[in-house]
Regions:
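Aromatic-rich carbohydrate-recognition surfaces in CAZymes
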Residues: 19-129, 151-159
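A generic signature of intrinsically disordered, low-complexity regions enriched in glycine/proline
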Residues: 13, 30, 74, 90, ...
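Catalytic cores of carbohydrate-active enzymes
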Residues: 2-5, 63-68, 130-136, 148-151, ...
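Acidic/His metal-coordination segments adjacent to aromatic residues that form catalytic metal sites
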Residues: 5-16, 65-82, 134-151
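Low-complexity, Ser/Thr/Pro/Gly-enriched N-terminal "stalk/linker" regions
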Residues: 1-22, 48, 52, 197
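A short, structure-level motif marking secondary-structure boundaries and short turns
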Residues: 16, 103, 173-174
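Short linear sequence elements within intrinsically disordered, low-complexity coil regions
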Residues: 7, 24, 103, 201-202
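A short small-residue
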Residues: 29, 141-145, 164-167
Length: 214
């Protein structure tokens, strides 16, 4: 899959061995960014990245933060024992991006149960049943930024992951589950807009759409 650095040009020692890894967040962003390239080697790296990550899910559905290239060992936290919530969010979105572009339904069927596990793991982070994820302190793989609870970055990705998973369920012909997931995505979207851009206007006077995102 996509590695964190050029394996031929970088000699790593100590904790830098992490760079000899497939990273979930970085690899999945690379999939999304390169999906329109008509290149067999890149397409192979996209598929290999997804397989590498989904073959090494934790039993509870957690996506590894990275997988070592030398021995295939998954790491779910990294140096310092931190978590990586955004890795799972990007992984679901990247999987849909790949299947939508390639039409690889065999890959989708092979990992359908594992995708469900990832979504269940993510859903468990909604600890108060308010549709949004409650992110632990420094819970994203973004240089340990000291932020927590409802984070716009994560919530928008959560919305996107639900849309992506709903579309994958449609491809699996699980139409009832797909409809439920897509309806939930719109409820998440409305919750994000209401919480992050609140208004003091009475609800009856407020415009139907003050802000929007795709």
């Amino acid at each position: 899959g996509f590695s964190a650095c050029s394996l031929a040009d970088n000699e790593v020692t100590g904790t830098d061995v992490n760079y000899r890894s497939v990273w979930a967040r970085d690899g999945c962003i690379a999939i999304i960014g390169s999906i329109e390239l008509d290149d067999a080697e890149i397409r192979g790296a996209q598929e290999a990245t997804l397989r590498t990550l989904f073959d090494r899910l934790a039993p509870n559905g957690q996506v590894p933060a990275n997988v070592r290239l030398d021995d295939g060992t998954p790491d779910y936290s990294g140096v310092g024992g931190i978590c990586s919530v955004d890795s799972a969010l990007w992984t679901v979105i990247a999987f849909h991006t790949y299947v939508r572009k390639t039409g690889d339904l065999d890959l989708l069927h092979a990992y359908a149960a594992r995708l469900r596990g990832v979504m269940d793991w993510l859903g468990a982070l909604d600890s108060n049943n308010d549709l949004l994820l409650e992110i632990p302190e420094a819970g994203d793989w973004t240089d340990l930024f000291g932020r927590s609870y409802h984070i716009l970055y994560d919530e928008v990705l959560w919305y996107g992951a639900n849309v992506a998973y709903g579309r994958l369920l449609e491809l699996l012909q699980h139409f009832d589950a797909a409809s439920e997931c897509l309806r939930r995505s719109q409820a998440i979207r409305s919750k994000i807009l209401a919480d992050f851009w609140p208004s003091t206007q009475p609800a009856a006077n407020a415009p139907a759409e003050r802000f929007g995102f795709a």
